[in-house]
Curated annotation (Swiss-Prot):
InterPro entries: Glyco_trans_19
Name the record gives this protein: Lipid-A-disaccharide synthase
Highest taxon of the lineage: Bacteria
Protein keywords: Glycosyltransferase, Lipid A biosynthesis, Lipid biosynthesis, Lipid metabolism, Transferase
Reaction it catalyzes: a lipid X + a UDP-2-N,3-O-bis[(3R)-3-hydroxyacyl]-alpha-D-glucosamine = a lipid A disaccharide + UDP + H(+)
Organism whose genome encodes this protein: Pseudomonas aeruginosa (strain ATCC 15692 / DSM 22644 / CIP 104116 / JCM 14847 / LMG 12228 / 1C / PRS 101 / PAO1)
Pathway(s) where this gene product acts: Bacterial outer membrane biogenesis; LPS lipid A biosynthesis
GO BP terms, alphabetized: lipid A biosynthetic process
EC number: 2.4.1.182
Length: 378
């Protein structure tokens, strides 16, 4: 491989900035004489990326917000494509944010540049025809999960399973006693974590339901305590409003600290989403619940091809953790499903441990190796 390797990376949100910085460290460890260009956040810039514009300009959530910013996003993407084609990097890596990065990858590949996509979109679950666009856009997909890699292999897309970075960050055995001490929770007695999501809409749909479930469980188990990590000040205020006028609960609200809550608890009532992977890695028995607007649910039922909604079940390939969705998610049903797991969640935990070890691949190192192998092939 020639000296002076030039690598372009494009990340669009905070999670991509974390993945990108880890990948950059691993690439530099293998190839010290390397230049990074593209778009990234503060972590990637700290690793030496010359970002063409602030990553925050790509971080847009919600249909209305996207439509409002669409002209700017399209203009930035067009300029970025032109700039990268002129820069002729040895490889371009799009990190997540597929609605933006796949279009960049496609144009660069048409211009004869090598392209990689890091973090698979959920094509295995819905809009599966997107795999055709992915096959045209990138020379290599870097997948965080083995079931994603199998999906791409079946559809003729070059893929490398690299593992998940969190599997290396989170210890195989978390120290429950130490986490409780840090949170000021009693060392003995049972603790249930309530995790109704990080977005306002999720908390609006699930917050009161989770609190109702907690009150039911407290009647059965008077010594039970609860901990609820709030993703932001707005989410904390939302929960505090829901607590007004209720029977008192032995509930500790946390500012962030979701990992501490998972380490400290005995079991989790959790919204479907990426937090279920964190709960799995902390080996905490869980029940997954989710509610959306009725029309949204009917549309998703028609679109989604996967039999499961939670990552633990997708990774296990079977119904390992209970999923109570929409009308099935009632306080009575959730309490009845959680209660046995507070007594014995060993069946879930055994599978969680095996999955954790399978995902513990040192994702950044694996991804760097795959990228450099791609560069060397030409």
């Amino acid at each position: 491989m020639a000296d002076g390797l030039r690598v372009a990376l494009v990340a669009g949100e905070a999670s991509g900035d974390i993945l990108g910085s880890g990948l950059m460290q691993a690439l530099r460890a293998r190839h010290p004489d390397i230049e990074f260009i593209g778009v990234g956040g503060p972590r990637m810039e700290a690793e030496g990326l010359s970002s063409y514009f602030p990553m925050e300009r790509l971080s847009v959530m919600g249909l209305v917000e996207v439509l409002g910013r669409l002209p700017e996003l399209l203009r930035r993407r067009k300029r970025l494509i032109r700039t990268l084609i002129e820069a002729r990097p040895d490889v371009m890596i799009g990190i997540d944010a597929p609605d933006f990065t796949l279009g960049v990858e496609h144009k660069l590949r048409q211009a004869g540049l090598r392209t990689v996509h890091y973090v698979s979109p959920s094509v295995w679950a819905w809009r599966q025809k997107r795999v055709l666009k992915i096959r045209e856009a990138c020379d290599l997909m870097l997948a965080l999960f083995p079931f994603e890699a199998r999906f791409y292999e079946e559809h003729g897309v070059p893929v490398r399973f690299v593992g998940h970075p969190l599997a290396n960050t989170i210890p195989l055995q978390a120290d429950r006693a130490a986490a409780r001490a840090r949170l000021g929770l009693p060392a003995d007695g049972q603790v249930l974590a309530l995790m109704p999501g990080s977005r306002g809409g999720e908390v609006g749909k699930l917050g009161a339901l989770f609190l109702d479930t907690a009150q039911r469980l407290l009647v059965e188990r008077p010594g039970l305590r609860f901990v609820l990590p709030c993703a932001s000040a707005a989410r904390r205020e939302q929960i505090e409003q829901m607590l007004q006028g209720r029977e008192p609960l032995p509930l500790t609200l946390l500012d962030g600290a979701s990992h501490e809550a998972l380490a400290a608890c005995d079991a989790v009532l959790i919204a479907s989403g990426t937090a279920t992977l964190e709960a799995l890695l902390y080996k905490r028995p869980m029940v997954v619940a989710y509610r959306v607007a009725g029309l949204t649910y009917r549309i998703l039922k028609r679109l989604v091809k996967s039999p499961y909604i939670s990552l633990p079940n997708l990774l296990a390939g079977r119904l390992l953790v209970p999923e109570l969705i929409q009308d099935a998610a009632t306080p009575q049903a959730l309490a009845a499903t959680l209660s046995p797991l507070l007594d014995d969640g060993s069946q879930q935990v055994e599978f969680f441990d095996a999955i954790h070890r399978a995902l513990r691949q040192d994702a950044s190192a694996q991804a760097a190796e795959a990228v450099l192998q791609l560069v060397e092939r030409r």
